[in-house]
Amino acid sequence: MDWEREWERLNPYQREAVTDENKACLVSANVGSGKTTVLTAKILYLHEVKHVSYRDMVVLTFTNKAASEIRERLVRADPSVTPEETENFGTFHGVALGLLKKRLPVETLGYTKDFMVMEPDEELELAHTLIAEKKLKIKYKNRLRKRLAEAERVSAAGDAGVAGSQDDLEILAGLLTEEKLRRNKMTFSDLMKNACLLMAKEEGEEERSADIQWVIVDEVQDCDGKQLEFIDCFMAEGAKLFAVGDPNQVIY
């Protein structure tokens, strides 16, 4: 790999960002400022200069297209890189899925490695089935998906209950969790939540299943609460953060 050629392409500001090794580095990059170039250069710098294995990096993007572009640029610069080495390069849900399938002990949660992903419509249909079977009293069924997401958020925060909930929503949420486990299925939300849960259980241990050294994030300004929590899970294990974003394009 010709690292010097990649280095020569960077301007002084980009070089400063690429070589920054602080616990967390946030790079403000507007449209057309060479964001993908900086991300790729950071990955190459860590691998070639700091000798960090590609496997020990997590690269998080919001689309498969963005992840593919980073991989393609990486391969052009380093033809020796293999798909296996970049299996942790992808969307938030995709990376969480890969970690659960290949590196994290999902068996401790009651799942097997061949668990499937439950689509949102399937979860909603299951919820309605449980309501009918268990004769649950649920208000605002037309907003059930949103209410279940809120119940999950409140539960994760450790609160006593869903504010203003005067029905069986919490019972339904518990039954849904049990049924998903019985079917060996996780929702997209479960992927990040369970990956974080398993990494937290290993916090402080000398040998960890994930053992990620760097988290590199594209379009960080678009992260919602769950995605930020996912990033925090890696940092709690000792990983450093390098994030690139455009503050003028904030969605959340």
Regions found by a protein language model. Give the residues of each.
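Conserved phosphoryl-transfer catalytic core
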Residues: 77-78, 124, 237-250
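Accessory N-terminal region flanking or inserted into the helicase ATPase core
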Residues: 1-28, 33, 37-40, 56-58, ...
